[in-house]
A protein has these predicted regions:
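Short cationic amphipathic helices and targeting signals
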Residues: 52-58
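Short S/T/G/P-rich N-terminal loop/turn motif that feeds into the first structured element of a domain
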Residues: 1-51, 62-64, 87-109
Length: 109
């Protein structure tokens, strides 16, 4: 599985819903991620200027991630919601090893 990071900013509709009915969102989201065979590693709320939610999860593909994000965005409770692929240190090294090999064909003038 591949590692992904999700981060976004909840809107006032989300805050209003939580004020009216405070609830643990993790079990609700887990039902959704389970449908895509994903594993949640971290599920965190924070209060920064840029984002109020941060999650790390494992998924099989970018397509699965984008499908999850489309459902999340359609809820209307997020100002923005983004995802990106994350690499551990060995994966990161392999990317640069591949780039180094590819660099041999790059000619500058």
């Amino acid at each position: 599985m591949k590692t992904y990071i999700i981060y976004g900013k909840a809107n006032s509709e989300y805050a209003s819903g939580m004020l009216n009915k405070p609830q643990d969102r993790l079990p609700i989201i887990k039902n959704l991620t389970d449908q895509f065979g994903m594993k949640i590693r971290e599920f965190l709320f924070t209060h920064t200027e840029s984002f109020t939610f941060f999650s790390v999860l494992d998924a099989n593909s970018d397509e699965d991630m984008e499908s999850l994000m489309n459902i999340t965005r359609a809820s209307g409770t997020w100002t923005n919601m983004y995802w990106s692929r994350a690499f551990d240190s060995l994966e990161h090294m392999k990317i640069y090893e591949k780039a180094k090999t590819g660099m041999a064909s790059y000619v500058t003038t």
